């Protein structure tokens, strides 16, 4: 009976990961959409990612403690409700035409995603004893399905409802801002429906079913966890930085409009989806850390080629990085939380805080891009910022993942 419950739980969690990916990737549509509406610089536009991923740092530890008390199943329900609230706030934000309101709504929405992330990832690993990395990669493939469909959804329902002229009136800009209202209202309704479904399913609280430990080391005494949390920081920062500026790079270097450029995001995030489905199969034969090292090295090579070669080849190389990003988050997470026992929920909260890399790295790249724009230099040099992130991931895959003998 327990095995059936665990299988049902894993299956239902695919909806959670799908929604997280779908909503998160819409930020890559919001940046080029809101930039001309509010006359933003690259740095100001990147504040969308700062507010969204900043919520991970502020709320990750909070939800880690909350979920350790209420359990993973109720943590999932709570996450969906908060997410729905944030999505609904996009309606008044667009109505008043306030960029600050948009950022506030994004923070609340992101807080819901943080709660889902904090509950969902360890939930999967605890349901998958002996197959933690493989099953988390498989379930997160549905996260990538969401990130693949998100740009299509966003470009059709948001960009198609906007005007393309560079000299829009204030009224036209407000009308363009309102194009996000119905899509996000729909996401709010969908989130509430998922909250109801998860509540009615009565998922098993696997952590409470684990035997209590008489002694417990400090979470931060586990070096593999500390290195892993930093790995998540740099992975999310690098991935989000590339995704955030990919559309703007295509616009600038290939003279494509925003809607056409957004289609390339499908290849970036779609590559991650393909890589995760493939990775879940290959991890039966390849050690997770070795697979991670190969993908990190491949990403380094692709970004370096993009910077050195430039042109169409560079942008296609950056797009292909998405494929190698595929297994990084679930693999780093599973390696970092391995054998942590009852510290797992708190560890997940700290790792959720580490996702703040997505808030800090893109603005750094934004500042570098603004500097390069001012001096009319090659914008691709700014991709040196995410390049450095992948070097750390390579370190974690080769050495940082190792547990101490007495862990």
UniProtKB/Swiss-Prot annotation:
InterPro entries attached to this UniProt entry:
Glc/Gal_transptr_bac (IPR005964), MFS (IPR011701), MFS_trans_sf (IPR036259), MFS_TsgA-like (IPR050375)
Q: Which family does it belong to?
A: Belongs to the major facilitator superfamily. FHS transporter (TC 2.A.1.7) family.
Domain of life, per UniProt, equals Bacteria
- Identify the gene encoding this protein: gluP
UniProt source species: Helicobacter pylori (strain J99 / ATCC 700824) (Campylobacter pylori J99)
- One function term, GO molecular function aspect: D-glucose transmembrane transporter activity
- What is the official name of this protein in its record? Putative glucose/galactose transporter
Q: Where in the cell is it found?
A: Cell inner membrane
Ranges annotated as spanning the membrane: 11-31, 47-67, 70-90, 96-116, 139-159, 180-200, 225-245, 263-283, 300-320, 321-341, 349-369, 378-398
